[in-house]
Amino acid sequence: GTLTRKGRLFNPSVSPDGTMLAAVEYPVTGGSAIVILNPATGKVLRRRQMPDSLQAVEPRFMGNALIFNAISEGGSAIYRINAGLDGEPECLLGPVKVSIRNLNPVNDKVYFSSDRDGTQELYSINTESRKVFQHTSLPYGGDEFCFIGQDVIFSMLTKDGRLLHKAPALEMSGKEVDFNDIHQYRVADKLTMQERAFAALKCI
């Protein structure tokens, strides 16, 4: 049934112990907020309004904190705030004028996908050292990376269409990168990649 009766809530995330539900609220008046709800009743327990210059997107629980990505005039970034939603959000990465999405906290890292090098690839940031690693470099990129046990499932464009692939997580240990070093011709190269992919699809 319906858990909440009003509001515009998106991208829900459940805490590891199942006692809290986080979501992003986009009020009709504008702006954005992160809200913590009771997952059984839908009652709002806490609410944190974001600055007008920051649009929160995906909140994810990580220990006693919330990790969330946000968009501002400077680009995309990853922030951390305690689950009590008090204190100031701490910027872990960015802002950078690339996409950052599909956050997935695992132990002391946050995995995410980004088009930093021209195609969507899997990255991670160590929340303590702030080191960033690139874990994939696929011909046409990949997306919707999902960790299941010791494997990673993801969607990848091939000549046979957009297919799901599985790979051992250990094979994606990654290389450290400077996330601010953006592909100079990112947009043009991405369009070229897409054109090649569509051309390959037409040839089969």
Q: Where are these predicted regions, by residue range?
A:
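Conserved beta-propeller blade repeats
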Residues: K6-E25, R48-N69, E90-S113, Q134-I153
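Short polar/acidic secondary-structure junctions
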Residues: Y26-V28, P39, I71-S72, A83, ...
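Structural motif
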Residues: T29-V35, G74-R80, G118-Y123, D160-A167
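Beta-strand-dominated lipid-handling architectures at cellular/organellar boundaries
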Residues: G30, G84-L85, N104
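Short loop/turn segments that connect beta-strands within beta-propeller blades
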Residues: N38-G42, N82-D86, N126-R130, A169-L170
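Outer-membrane beta-barrel initiation region
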Residues: S114, R162-L163, P168-I204
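Extended, hydrophobic interaction surfaces within ordered domains
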Residues: F133-F179
